[in-house]
Structures are given as C-alpha cells and as structure tokens.
Amino acid sequence: MKQSHFFAHLSRLKLINRWPLMRNVRTENVSEHSLQVAMVAHALAAIKNRKFGGQLNAEHIALLAMYHDTSEVLTGDLPTPVKYFNSQIAQEYKAIEKIAQQKLVDMAPDELRDIFAPLIDENAWSEEEQAIVKQADALCAYLKCLEELSAGNNEFKLAKTRLEKTLALRRSQEMDYFMAVFVPSFHLSLDEISQDSPL
C-alpha cells in the first residue's frame, strides 16, 4: 500500500496560530478553531431544522466545518487585514487556497480521494451549507473577541466591531437564536455559568 501524508499534514493544523498580528491572552490554533466552528455550524443547522423549517444534514455540515480551514496547513493563516486589503489580494489568496485544497486532496489515497475532496473543496458544498459554515466561522471569531475582551485585552475591540458588521451581513433566524440563547454566557465567569449546575 502506498503511504499518504494527508493526516500528517492535517495534524499540523494545531501548530498554526490564528490572529497572528494581535496580542492574545490565550493563543488559539486552527485545529481548535475548526472544532468550535464544527460545533457551532452543527448547532445552527439543527436550530434551522428544528425551529425554522430547515432540511439540512446537520452532521454533514459539522464535517464540512471541521475541514473548512484545512488549506491553511499549507498556506498559513493570513491575517484578515492583509487578506482583504484590496480585491486583487483577496482574489489571489482565493486562488492560492484552491491550489492548497487540491494539493491536500491529491495527498489522500486514490481509493479515498472522492470522500475527502468534497469536504475540502468548498465548490462542492451547496450555497446553504456554505452560508451556515461562514456564519459559524464568523460567530466563533466573534466569541474569541468576547473572550479576549472579557480578559481585559482591548486589542480585540476593533476586531469585535468588524465582526459585528460581518454577522449583520450574514444574519439569519438561526444565528439570531444562537446569539440570544448561547452568546450572553460568554460574558460571564466560570463561577457564574456554573451556579445553576453544581457537581
């Protein structure tokens, strides 16, 4: 059997730090970010299905979210102000992402490639799946800002404002539900969120 470096590369997502130009109280890596995005994307899809008549496969969306940043194992995490400095840079970075995604897919064994390709290549996702994962991605970045700000790190003040605008652009009923039900707890301390459920 031919050796594959696919998962050896993916395991290095934990070595790539997000928010590289900003001082962080707690450093966040791409691997843990991807897990949180998967959880939130699953929740958004489930909320849409349960509350707002959606017909989404929430488990599949969680899987897509797990793989949504895998190309960064080859490209690194380019800071948002650089990535979107102008439309030309944004377009070129998208092209680089596509090349990295294809390179990752090509690392998978031939007999498994058709399984991993549609998880890594966003072009294989439906518009609705893309929208949910993008909402979850922005929500998780916003939650990171709340955590940093609550720890006294004002470095994330502008990022929070920028992400509030992004969330407004991606707004949906399921996001409104998530923001109302789950997000307020991120402003609280461990003692405050543990009061109602002592062990």
UniProtKB/Swiss-Prot annotation:
Keywords: Cytoplasm, Hydrolase, Metal-binding, Nucleotide-binding. Substrate binds at R18, W19, H33, D69, D77, L78, P79, T80, D137. InterPro entries: HD/PDEase_dom (IPR003607), HD_domain (IPR006674), YfbR (IPR022971), YfbR/HDDC2 (IPR039356). It holds the Pfam family YfbR-like. One of its GO terms (cellular component) is cytoplasm. A divalent metal cation binds at H33, H68, D69, D137. Its cofactor is a divalent metal cation. Homodimer. Belongs to the 5DNU family. This is 5'-deoxynucleotidase YfbR. It comes from Salmonella arizonae (strain ATCC BAA-731 / CDC346-86 / RSK2980).
